């Protein structure tokens, strides 16, 4: 049963506030920025405005930290949150809203956010799934388990995916 059916609106907002605050804090701590909230989804990016060699590793670290933090949130009795996270690496175009200047704009354009969203659909609960390019750039600090190749909607060739463990 979904949270919207199990919780009254005030409790639901408290859970969402805790979840989104945790995501915001963790992404920021790892050098990233949250671009958009999409329902219970969070779109974050690393390497804006200045790309660093550590961006892919920081993104994977943040994803693992979010997955782990959800189990530690103080939620109403009987409520637990599970995550499915996709991480992809590549070029994007950032669309900032005029005057904001903080990097949270109307969105990002490019193959990379679509890849991350599609990889999320491959993930099982509490799994961080990364694209091969991300794995290659963030190879040292993590252990990966090959998940295989997948035909992802919108991508002409199969995509190789890995679980960050």
Region locations from a protein language model:
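Nucleotide phosphate-binding site architecture
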Residues: 1, 13, 43-44, 93-94, ...
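Catalytic core of nucleotidyl cyclases, primarily class III adenylyl/guanylyl cyclases
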Residues: 26-58, 70-112, 159-162
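Cytosolic regulatory/linker segments at or just downstream of nucleotide-handling modules
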Residues: 90-94, 107, 116, 121-165
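Conserved long alpha-helical elements within nucleotide-processing catalytic cores of c-di-GMP signaling
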Residues: 1-24, 28, 35-36
